[in-house]
Amino acid sequence: MKRDLTRDPVTKSMLLFAIPMILGDLLQQCYNIADTLIVGQFLGRDALAAVGSAFTLMTFLTSIILGLCMGSGALFSMRFGQRDEKALCENLCASFFFIALVTVFLNILSFACLDGLRTFLRVPAEVWSDMREYLFVIFMGIPAVFLYNYFASFLRAIGNSVIPLGFLAVSAVLNIALDLWFVIGLNRGVAGAAEATVIAQYVSGLGIAVFTLARFPQVRSIWKLRCLRRGRIQEIVSFSTLTCVQQSVMNLGILMVQGLVNSFGPIVMAAFAAAVKIDAFAYMPVQDFGNAFSTFIAQNYGAKESERIRAGLKSAVCISMAFCVVISALVFVFARPLMAIFVDAGETEVILEGVRYLRIEGAFYCGIGCLFLLYGLYRALGRPGMSVVLTVVSLGTRVALAYLLSAIPAIGVIGIWWSVPIGWALADLTGLFYYKARKKELLA
């Protein structure tokens, strides 16, 4: 099913398009959380710290692929809005080969640098063995991440967010079932948790690839080398590379913060591992809504529907802020029972540190909600460079303040937690100022 976001009622079309994306990411988070929950409850604190640190690293690596796919998807949306089938096919071909080459290079580099990661991330000796074992397996799933995100980006670009949801649902259920079997039934340890995730990733990646190639003839142009055009390759590199930089800079900053967290030992590492999963789960719907909003803006920008863009922007701000207020209240109130889901009740220090993190971050979700809308807006309007600027402001502030504040004995680790909302606020102010100064030019 295709959804034309240039014709349907503005708010209704955004919500109907966003809901399957939100549900899909909920499932994605479910199979990320499955690793954390099962490892934390059945393998202990050190294993939880290992998987948590490995997850942060994998998020950085896969963000490179995700950014390339998101940038290409914005261009696909514009071509769909313009009804330019020939240009769409050429963009598909150029993007597939470009992102596939990056994926192969990234996969080789990951294995080559595996043993050097311990020093870079400052991983304690008691955690490294489990972390290395987990990473060695999980790196094998990087090609599957490319397949799923590439074909999902095409489907979403033409307004179909339901099919990616279906494949993700199958993958999530399979991952949780395999997690339980491998970790608890077969005693495979952290390697079993990683194996479950990789198998599930290939099911969703190969499945969506086969479906899309069979259902949409224009996608088969990815195999036609004659469709490669120098101009199209330059377009893809321009759009996707800047979005990739935005995503990878964001996650590189988080990875640097992870290294700082690791220096505080296994208790803080375990608290951070669990709290970050809760945090991501809480604001994930508004992140997906920002991506849906971006597709809406891109299609209408391609169709030159400036009034719909303005109406969509107003509607998106109201929806996003309303959600953030509600979820902030819930996370603040239920921080302790949420931590208890992931951590054994006897680990009181871990739970206490996680609660402190959640109550600080959770109070400021409106900041990240606004930032996701700004990312989506500038990406859709062909200004991905501005998204990079906002990311540098947000993450640069976060990393700098985290290292500065945590070095003060009276503040310590809580300085890392406070650096996050401060970074969001500064990036929001930067993005809003730019929009106000360039509004006529942007929406022309």
Please state what every model-predicted region is.
Residues L5-L43, T56-G71, L75, A100-N107, ...:
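N-terminal transmembrane alpha-helices
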Residues L48-I108, V145-P164, A271-A335, I368-L390:
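Small-residue-rich hydrophobic transmembrane alpha-helices
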Residues C69, I138-R156, P164-A172, A193-I208, ...:
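Short runs within selected transmembrane alpha-helices of multi-pass transporters and secretion channels
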